[in-house]
């Protein structure tokens, strides 16, 4: 899929569901370019008025619009159109994303073990709760929390950005309701002269309530913008087994997840995988496009607690979860490493 040429920009009004659409060309979104001479990446900047991503699901920091290695591309909008009326993603021709899911690259969502954001259960309608990386959000009613509802952003916190030629650091400081407050720093770094990107997270609990959450990295991988199909392979250091019916779209062979055919139309693949252990070494996910001969291996430094794989024809998206617990006055750090490579041709001995 070619990167989307035009994207609809959303301006959120004070009432939660009053949304206006306005058209912007891609260059209108605030961004910075990173390069280490091997990798080249475009990183979008958080901006409440003009930012590429302004939903209430994912962390606003670290949204990557593109990354290139040896003439291969890895990230870019997986959706072909944007519609604020769409709850999540409408799969078809075209693929249409709603405001909370219209993201690009590796993006993180913080979600509690109960499936809700911090402080949502305690908050009454009209009061605020806490979505790390987004802000203090207003609870609309007594319905169950949903990542796909666009809650009004009452306070986006204090944000700052620092950057150099091959790195960028985002910081958000925020006090939410129910005693939650934090300082959250994310650093994206391209290692010198290596095809490696590192994302480092640092969360400091500055509030009175303990932060007990899970966070998953939603990796929207559109390698070379080619159709998801038999050439798209996801592999692991363990033998996984699917906990849901894959609907005839996928199969597991040993340590690999394969797609049975080209996904098309409204085909949607999703399953959660079991089989990983309690060691961080199992957080190693390899995604390859064996048609274009490009791949990436994603490693985390914490044990997996859940692992989902979502795919449509334009994207393959591993969703690995880890647990984060931070007592008041304490801090937590975690890291993801992305190593990019070219897939060897049959008969070659190793990746490059």
Map each language-model feature to its residues.
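Positively charged n-region of N-terminal signal peptides that target proteins for export
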Residues: 1-6
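Bacterial N-terminal signal peptides
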Residues: 8-18
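Surface-exposed acidic/polar loop and edge beta-strand patches at domain peripheries
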Residues: 22-198, 209-212, 218-352
